[in-house]
Amino acid sequence: MTPNSMTENGLTAWDKPKHCPDREHDWKLVGMSEACLHRKSHSERRSTLKNEQSSPHLIQTTWTSSIFHLDHDDVNDQSVSSAQTFQTEEKKCKGYIPSYLDKDELCVVCGDKATGYHYRCITCEGCKGFFRRTIQKNLHPSYSCKYEGKCVIDKVTRNQCQECRFKKCIYVGMATDLVLDDSKRLAKRKLIEENREKRRREELQKSIGHKPEPTDEEWELIKTVTEAHVATNAQGSHWKQKRKFLPEDIGQAPIVNAPEGGKVDLEAFSHFTKIITPAITRVVDFAKKLPMFCELPCEDQIILLKGCCMEIMSLRAAVRYDPESETLTLNGEMAVTRGQLKNGGLGVVSDAIFDLGMSLSSFNLDDTEVALLQAVLLMSSDRPGLACVERIEKYQDSFLLAFEHYINYRKHHVTHFWPKLLMKVTDLRMIGACHASRFLHMKVECPTELFPPLFLEVFED
């Protein structure tokens, strides 16, 4: 048998013999194949003939250009392996197929089912991987064809001759410059993962939906609360310019021993009691400017005010924490250190207020957010002795909903801003409870004349 001059995809093709009907015909084919392999040396031909004669059946002569198609019983291990490889690749090809491919579009290299546009050509996964590995590992110089580069490359023969397969990849237009090295491939994979994660976050955001902002009715409520706070907040935004620092020597010499190892500096305590009455008055005025509060029975108003007064005063002090001087400004006028506030009567409560101030400094709260926090604290329906519990709870829900929508409107860049801010309500409630316990001990240890009447009225049961 001699090579046919017919070409396939630009490469010389070999005629494929038909199935061998009997052994006599098989031996004729052996002779034909020997003639076709005249390129081999005499010893190679003798070795080939000897191997063929050692089997009762004709063993497949493995050419990359031509494969004898024998009966199933005559297929050797190598042909079985090729078939298994083909089946595996065929299964892979049944996966995702891009929408831009026509139905049953074939690989331009081997004719297998194409899976996409790879390195400028429409190819199957097998040829894509072969081309990529060849370029990345610089394997093509080591490829060699035993049959003068005349192999036909199809989905059955593609694994038989690497040189002819690679040449056909180049011939059909696969671009070597598009194959990435390890570093570029890792960078591309990282970029793909980042884009995938970005899309996932965007889809998650869409699934959550657009965060609602305040309605017109809620804006009216927010405006009322904000105006009430601004009108009753001493010094407003000018507190830093108008504050006065408590002298350093005050609050450093404890005189009276308080329970639980705490000590009280009576001079510092005296300074604090002078500003406590106007501070309490401002909290009361804030509450009276809220229509919802004024609609409640007088008894409930008193209970709510007594319950929230220390909490609101602590909040107003905490939002005026100054990291540079490490002080809190009380009632917008007196800047005190942690030690001074502690020795002045508050003891461990001062630590909680300072810690709250340090935490809130990163929240960058505006007047409206502080005002809404105060309204939420004021309308706490769990205060003992309340008559209109459901109404107060409903009022608090209204403030909370408007508050949440306002937070959405503000678009803070702090992660989980809203739940973190709500946790501060819990912290303030704890401060109020600790102060109530501290006050009972202070009444016993400090002279009664040092306590202003309004202070006693608010904090006594």
Swiss-Prot record:
Q: What is the effect of changing D355R?
A: Stabilizes homodimer
**Where along the chain is Zn(2+) 1 bound?**
C107, C110, C124, C127
Q: Where does 3,3',5-triiodo-L-thyronine 1 bind?
A: H435
Which SMART domains does the annotation name? HOLI (SM00430), ZnF_C4 (SM00399)
Residues given in the record as Zn(2+) 2 binding sites: C145, C151, C161, C164
Domain named NR LBD is located at 217-461
Q: Which UniProt keywords apply?
A: Deafness, Disease variant, DNA-binding, Metal-binding, Nucleus, Receptor, Transcription, Transcription regulation, Zinc, Zinc-finger
Q: Superkingdom of this entry's organism? A: Eukaryota
Instruction: Give the recorded effect for R243Q.
Output: Impairs hormone binding and ligand-dependent conformational changes
Zinc fingers (NR C4-type), renumbered ranges: 107-127, 145-169
PROSITE patterns annotated for this entry? NR_LBD, NUCLEAR_REC_DBD_1, NUCLEAR_REC_DBD_2
Residues the entry annotates as binding L-thyroxine: R282, N331, H435
Q: Which disease is it linked to?
A: Thyroid hormone resistance, generalized, autosomal dominant: An autosomal dominant disease characterized by high levels of circulating thyroid hormones (T3-T4), goiter, abnormal mental functions, increased susceptibility to infections, abnormal growth and bone maturation, tachycardia and deafness. Affected individuals may also have attention deficit-hyperactivity disorders (ADHD) and language difficulties. Patients have normal or slightly elevated thyroid stimulating hormone (TSH). Thyroid hormone resistance, generalized, autosomal recessive: An autosomal recessive disorder characterized by goiter, clinical euthyroidism, end-organ unresponsiveness to thyroid hormone, abnormal growth and bone maturation, and deafness. Patients also have high levels of circulating thyroid hormones, with elevated thyroid stimulating hormone.
Q: Which family does it belong to?
A: Belongs to the nuclear hormone receptor family. NR1 subfamily.
Q: What does this protein do?
A: Nuclear hormone receptor that can act as a repressor or activator of transcription. High affinity receptor for thyroid hormones, including triiodothyronine and thyroxine.
PANTHER family reported in the protein's UniProt record: NUCLEAR HORMONE RECEPTOR, THYROID HORMONE RECEPTOR BETA
The name on file for this protein is Thyroid hormone receptor beta
Question: What gene does the UniProt entry assign to this protein?
Answer: THRB
